């Protein structure tokens, strides 16, 4: 019988060394790295400078506390110490004034109490440990939260002017500081609500998560805006954002063509909830794909063009755009959640949808339909570009809803509409101007951008490049946005030459 050589039908047998748990002597690994080096000299003069700032807080804020025993204070760190690894957690601890949040780069907020400020001054004066000295060297200023800071640099007059009109005033959005679990948070919220009631400022927190401490506040005049800006509990006050559909660049119509209807016997199909302006009921073929409707817009304010266009793409995308690659040809139904009223004067009466109203409508529908439908399309947004430092309130609330109801929101990256439109690659100036708009910064949402399906030789994107109107990331904390891109129409950067994708409206085919 011939002997098999190595590599001719049998594998080489290699020795195995078995290491059992706890086998052998454990050796302590010596720590590495050098002692923390301070960013500046922390001498007596510098310590006294910080002590004076804390004393100013004690004298200006603490005596004015009514009904509460704590106040937020702003801490600015130097630019070199903006990284989280330099965060002064030991200096601002539970024993002194704990950190309760952060804002822009190098901006922290701490909870100040009379006892905590006294402890903080003692630490600043006398503590010589390497850790404390390093953290003291990070501090630029310790200061009060000002009304201007709460208004994000806007004047009270400008804020009132930008706020949408309500029943008896103008609707603003107010966020409170979050002191964390305990009596202090309940106390500042109760004191805030009490003072607003005394001044006749109507509050409404419906639509916002309870622990977000967010309110719609209706202000009748500049004096009430100013009063809110001075309340200790308030972290920010802004105009209430308006929600709009992401309106297509062109809607040239053509006569209807025959499109496939849904087989009545085929009930086992995926369904997308279209959260939009409504889906037309006048086309029998499209109506066959609509599995249900929840219409929350009054008849005089209905304009279903945008919602119908979106639904047509979901149901018949490959049929109306046969030359576009990568389109799913399987059947898909839609559920019509009509929440966005008409905002085009050429189409009839107009009204606005507030951010708070959208959130209320969404949660109401989710309570009923979330177990059945898991993908919800939101081709809507605001005109507010996302910050690189913090997430938009709308994105935070949408993430809360997605987590609570275990659904996924598909969200538009937003459209840039001011000519000249965006180049690719983006110019340095366009990186800020063309950033995604809220709520495209949703972490759990799937943010979608548009690619060009045509090739512009000049003054426009090349094929497969981002469309000139499609906004880009990054989002807050440099998260990657958009999450997904697909063909969504194209145009030249001067807005003259348009090449859309095809779908339908009530009037017929549209591009």
Residues of each region from the PLM?
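Short secondary-structure boundary/capping segments
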Residues: 253-254, 287-292, 350-353, 359, ...
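Active-site neighborhood of phospho(di)ester-bond hydrolases with catalytic His/Asp-centered motifs
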Residues: 377-379, 409-414, 448-449
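Subtilisin-like peptidase catalytic core
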Residues: 184, 191-193, 203-204, 304-390, ...
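Short, surface-exposed ligand-recognition loops at beta-strand->loop->(often short) alpha-helix junctions
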Residues: 71-84, 175-187
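Catalytic-core regions built around general acid/base machinery
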Residues: 393-406, 435-438
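Subtilisin-like serine protease catalytic core
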Residues: 261-293, 297-354, 406, 419, ...
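Extracellular S/T/G-rich loop segment that most often corresponds to the catalytic His/Ser-adjacent loop
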Residues: 278, 284, 430-511
